[in-house]
Amino acid sequence: MKTFSSFFLSVTTLFFFSFFSLSFQASPSQSLYREIHQLISFKDVLPDKNLLPDWSSNKNPCTFDGVTCRDDKVTSIDLSSKPLNVGFSAVSSSLLSLTGLESLFLSNSHINGSVSGFKCSASLTSLDLSRNSLSGPVTTLTSLGSCSGLKFLNVSSNTLDFPGKVSGGLKLNSLEVLDLSANSISGANVVGWVLSDGCGELKHLAISGNKISGDVDVSRCVNLEFLDVSSNNFSTGIPFLGDCSALQHLDISGNKLSGDFSRAISTCTELKLLNISSNQFVGPIPPLPLKSLQYLSLAENKFTGEIPDFLSGACDTLTGLDLSGNHFYGAVPPFFGSCSLLESLALSSNNFSGELPMDTLLKMRGLKVLDLSFNEFSGELPESLTNLSASLLTLDLSSNNFSGPILPNLCQNPKNTLQELYLQNNGFTGKIPPTLSNCSELVSLHLSFNYLSGTIPSSLGSLSKLRDLKLWLNMLEGEIPQELMYVKTLETLILDFNDLTGEIPSGLSNCTNLNWISLSNNRLTGEIPKWIGRLENLAILKLSNNSFSGNIPAELGDCRSLIWLDLNTNLFNGTIPAAMFKQSGKIAANFIAGKRYVYIKNDGMKKECHGAGNLLEFQGIRSEQLNRLSTRNPCNITSRVYGGHTSPTFDNNGSMMFLDMSYNMLSGYIPKEIGSMPYLFILNLGHNDISGSIPDEVGDLRGLNILDLSSNKLDGRIPQAMSALTMLTEIDLSNNNLSGPIPEMGQFETFPPAKFLNNPGLCGYPLPRCDPSNADGYAHHQRSHGRRPASLAGSVAMGLLFSFVCIFGLILVGREMRKRRRKKEAELEMYAEGHGNSGDRTANNTNWKLTGVKEALSINLAAFEKPLRKLTFADLLQATNGFHNDSLIGSGGFGDVYKAILKDGSAVAIKKLIHVSGQGDREFMAEMETIGKIKHRNLVPLLGYCKVGDERLLVYEFMKYGSLEDVLHDPKKAGVKLNWSTRRKIAIGSARGLAFLHHNCSPHIIHRDMKSSNVLLDENLEARVSDFGMARLMSAMDTHLSVSTLAGTPGYVPPEYYQSFRCSTKGDVYSYGVVLLELLTGKRPTDSPDFGDNNLVGWVKQHAKLRISDVFDPELMKEDPALEIELLQHLKVAVACLDDRAWRRPTMVQVMAMFKEIQAGSGIDSQSTIRSIEDGGFSTIEMVDMSIKEVPEGKL
């Protein structure tokens, strides 16, 4: 028995050790057990427990998704593009603590928090945290100091910032690659902080896409191979590169650099990429290190002259060359023919001329992309172009002066690889060649803005890869070919302004990727097909100015991306379907991002001009060519033309933005569902047969900018809820059957009477006052708004009677005091009732809201100057003779201004604000106290203010010579003539005042309404900027642009305001530029017969191509012809201020610096000025970004 037990024990022991041995071999090593625990603990903190399904504690971690092992150790983890949704602390505690980890890649993994307070092992060499939501100071990266072996660090595309004053440095001397691009880093000492401890082994440094300024000194980084400092605020000079013999990639684009850069890069002999685009370099191209260069971009600067022959030294290695956006002229140099490796050549937006240099181009055997757009090439397309197009991927000849037919054999080569063909904005005639279908790889075909005739070839239906078909503004006729149904990749179909007939082809229902359909201004008929509702990507549908008929299909409400619907001027009937709006709050419009457009806002000056405006695709077309539309469109092409690139940012929460159904035969009611569109900014239902009342829900359209319900059969009252439409700049309710009082709150008091006419029962400002006996409902309206002048008069009469009874018991002094009081009360009563001698200014007579005569008379002025502190409202009444019309010296968007002579004989100006109902006393007084403290010799000081009931009066220092507008444009009336010396003083003074508001006030003040009528002149003709802070006050201190400002000052408003409705200091700079142009030209910003269809800005640009000095005021040239050079110098300043790209405009401090340079004698030649004017930035429609922003909660 004992023997058996021993045997059993031995067998059991042997079995146990054998099993243990086998189990150990099949399972992770002991070192991996700890790592399993760390990895699983990381998974456990993920919100989505199903995200890493194969990460399990009973598995070998080396088999986990994204995990790599070596020698039974986890050495690499790659979870890029997985939505981890965790804080960085979870990463540092679980993953970075893995002892054997060498690489951790977490790009685009939804990681947030600060990079601080952690340690990592010395084995970590690569860490990629790019494209996340990391925040906090970039200085927290010093926590990585424990990662002594770290060579690769990428934290780009986060929101890291720079704290300003810091000590020490990054202390990562082992780094070879450092990428801080696309964060929120700003300041002048960033590069110094990064490199404060030397460069170590650094080979790759990228800090692009921030707001860094100061110096870039990398002279100690002798190993540096890659340097990208693009898209920052560097302006002080060229980077200090030192010995850059190892540098291969240098990108300094998108800054404000100028000067001689060739010396700084002279030792960079191994450069393969050099990008200095979008800076401020001028003159001829300087010598460059060309030996190894593969890509060279000098685009978007101000280089001049012909292309120098020394660039041929790069032909042995050069594959890409971009010289676009400069001022080069002459012919394309023949030496390009020897650049056999060149694949991309961009010479757009220069002044090259002549015929296409085919001999040179055909020698460039490797050419794939050829962009010669926006030049002055002319003639017919040569037959030899067929041989070139066979090897090209992109051919862009848009916006030149080509003529004749489009070559029928352009695509005859069976090996043709052409993908993009841009021939728009030329003078091509004849028919569209059906043989274009032989270019079977075509993705984009753009033939708009020519003189092409005939039909659209049905053969285009065989282009199975075509995404964009743009043929607008030609003379095409016939029907839209049914064969387009086979182009299932089609996204953009733009055929406006032709002579097309027939119906929308049913085959287009197969093109489910369509996002922009624009068929306006043709002769199309039939109904809107219901299948359009199945186009889930459709964002823009334009069918205006055709002969479509039938009902508007409710299926349009199935379009999940529709933001722009223009159906005006057709024959539609029936009702507006409520189902159209069921996608509101769910729309995502990302499908049209990056599309170039112009929007022409109709001015309503011609009866034939229908609709709110016209949205046009505008890629590759010169802005001045818009005049060609006048032959096909009855509307004026005025200064109200806005453009840019669409960049929608809806996150599935958007709504329609533009809805125009005007000039049809629609009937029925306005559906209440129309109020569900928070992003709608234009609504036009005018000129239909719509009846019923305006639904209260219209008041929910808080982003609404333009509302037209005119010429319908609407009845009832204007909903009081519409007072909440604070963004409203235009309204037209005329020609209806509306009745009752016009709402007194919101924007209604800013609109002229014409917008409410021909509504028999409508009353109240700006129409005649309502008769209380007309309706019981109005009596209730009266009571809810306090006592009216009639009841006020009764109170005054009772007070006078009581005084008469008591007078016998009073002494003489008391009697005299009562006499004075009765006189003042009578004056107030007479004025408030509108029975005084106020001329025809009815608006003032009906507009006062006072709470008790005695209280009003005794209210003191809240003064910022001691001599005024005892003034009362009664004193102001007396000083203006009851605000008599004779005392009126000006009117503006914020109210009327009166001259008041005080008892001591001094004069002040009193501004009576338009009603700002809804703003509390606290906000008003706080704003006044802020404005009253602002003192500067070039600002009109606020002396005091007075609140009487709902009325607000502001008291200013009186300016003897009134406004610049009056003095400049009506010198006889003003009694003074402005010579150049005075105008220059006014220009500098107003700039100095505006600069003080922008840069010396905390927080800075945006004027929002800078114009010549807001530049006042004192007794010394010194400029004083007025009305600063008024737009902010009138919009209840919101950061949105004052609506009344937009409506009241055409010609001064920068283009970007009409897209984002947000103001900025750079918007003030634009407006100042217009004022400076007024001083130089002597012309008003709009409505001059010299301008034609332009405004002042466009007119000056036109003259830049002729004789620029012709724009100057002839009176100045008579004064001294030698002034021309100085006037040109000041014109250059105006040009800089008027750049359509807001980010390129100078600040007002920089404007002052420009004036200082001019005074110091640093001249600017006339050719330089002309070139600046011809630069794209001066156009009235160039490069204005349109952002369809998600509005924060509570702002709508």
Curated annotation (Swiss-Prot):
<dbReference type="GO" id="GO:0005768">
    <property type="term" value="C:endosome"/>
</dbReference>
<feature type="repeat" description="LRR 12">
    <location>
        <begin position="339"/>
        <end position="363"/>
    </location>
</feature>
<feature type="site" description="Interacts with SERK1">
    <location>
        <position position="765"/>
    </location>
</feature>
<feature type="modified residue" description="Phosphoserine">
    <location>
        <position position="1166"/>
    </location>
</feature>
<dbReference type="GO" id="GO:0032991">
    <property type="term" value="C:protein-containing complex"/>
</dbReference>
<feature type="repeat" description="LRR 4">
    <location>
        <begin position="148"/>
        <end position="169"/>
    </location>
</feature>
<feature type="repeat" description="LRR 18">
    <location>
        <begin position="488"/>
        <end position="511"/>
    </location>
</feature>
<feature type="modified residue" description="Phosphothreonine">
    <location>
        <position position="846"/>
    </location>
</feature>
<feature type="repeat" description="LRR 16">
    <location>
        <begin position="441"/>
        <end position="463"/>
    </location>
</feature>
<dbReference type="InterPro" id="IPR013210">
    <property type="entry name" value="LRR_N_plant-typ"/>
</dbReference>
<feature type="modified residue" description="Phosphoserine">
    <location>
        <position position="1172"/>
    </location>
</feature>
<feature type="repeat" description="LRR 8">
    <location>
        <begin position="245"/>
        <end position="268"/>
    </location>
</feature>
<feature type="modified residue" description="Phosphotyrosine">
    <location>
        <position position="1072"/>
    </location>
</feature>
<keyword id="KW-0067">ATP-binding</keyword>
<dbReference type="InterPro" id="IPR011009">
    <property type="entry name" value="Kinase-like_dom_sf"/>
</dbReference>
<feature type="repeat" description="LRR 14">
    <location>
        <begin position="390"/>
        <end position="413"/>
    </location>
</feature>
<feature type="glycosylation site" description="N-linked (GlcNAc...) asparagine">
    <location>
        <position position="112"/>
    </location>
</feature>
<dbReference type="GO" id="GO:0004714">
    <property type="term" value="F:transmembrane receptor protein tyrosine kinase activity"/>
</dbReference>
<feature type="modified residue" description="Phosphotyrosine">
    <location>
        <position position="956"/>
    </location>
</feature>
<comment type="similarity">
    <text>Belongs to the protein kinase superfamily. Ser/Thr protein kinase family.</text>
</comment>
<feature type="region of interest" description="SERK1 binding">
    <location>
        <begin position="640"/>
        <end position="642"/>
    </location>
</feature>
<feature type="glycosylation site" description="N-linked (GlcNAc...) asparagine">
    <location>
        <position position="154"/>
    </location>
</feature>
<feature type="glycosylation site" description="N-linked (GlcNAc...) asparagine">
    <location>
        <position position="233"/>
    </location>
</feature>
<feature type="binding site">
    <location>
        <position position="911"/>
    </location>
    <ligand>
        <name>ATP</name>
    </ligand>
</feature>
<feature type="short sequence motif" description="Cys pair 1">
    <location>
        <begin position="62"/>
        <end position="69"/>
    </location>
</feature>
<dbReference type="GO" id="GO:0106310">
    <property type="term" value="F:protein serine kinase activity"/>
</dbReference>
<feature type="modified residue" description="Phosphothreonine">
    <location>
        <position position="851"/>
    </location>
</feature>
<keyword id="KW-1133">Transmembrane helix</keyword>
<feature type="modified residue" description="Phosphothreonine">
    <location>
        <position position="842"/>
    </location>
</feature>
<keyword id="KW-0677">Repeat</keyword>
<feature type="modified residue" description="Phosphoserine">
    <location>
        <position position="1035"/>
    </location>
</feature>
<feature type="modified residue" description="Phosphoserine">
    <location>
        <position position="1168"/>
    </location>
</feature>
<dbReference type="InterPro" id="IPR045381">
    <property type="entry name" value="BRI1_island_dom"/>
</dbReference>
<feature type="active site" description="Proton acceptor">
    <location>
        <position position="1009"/>
    </location>
</feature>
<feature type="modified residue" description="Phosphothreonine">
    <location>
        <position position="982"/>
    </location>
</feature>
<feature type="glycosylation site" description="N-linked (GlcNAc...) asparagine">
    <location>
        <position position="636"/>
    </location>
</feature>
<keyword id="KW-0754">Steroid-binding</keyword>
<comment type="subunit">
    <text>Monomer or homodimer in the plasma membrane. Heterodimer with BAK1 in the endosomes. Interacts with SERK1 and TTL in a kinase-dependent manner. Bind to SERK1 in a brassinolide-dependent manner. Component of the SERK1 signaling complex, composed of KAPP, CDC48A, GRF6 or GRF7, SERK1, SERK2, SERK3/BAK1 and BRI1. Interacts with CDG1. No interactions with PSKR1 or CNGC17. Interacts with BIK1. Interacts with B'ALPHA, B'BETA, B'GAMMA and B'ETA. Interacts with BSK1 and BSK3. Interacts with BSK5, BSK6 and BSK11.</text>
</comment>
<keyword id="KW-0812">Transmembrane</keyword>
<keyword id="KW-0808">Transferase</keyword>
<protein>
    <recommendedName>
        <fullName>Protein BRASSINOSTEROID INSENSITIVE 1</fullName>
        <ecNumber>2.7.10.1</ecNumber>
        <ecNumber>2.7.11.1</ecNumber>
    </recommendedName>
</protein>
<dbReference type="GO" id="GO:0010584">
    <property type="term" value="P:pollen exine formation"/>
</dbReference>
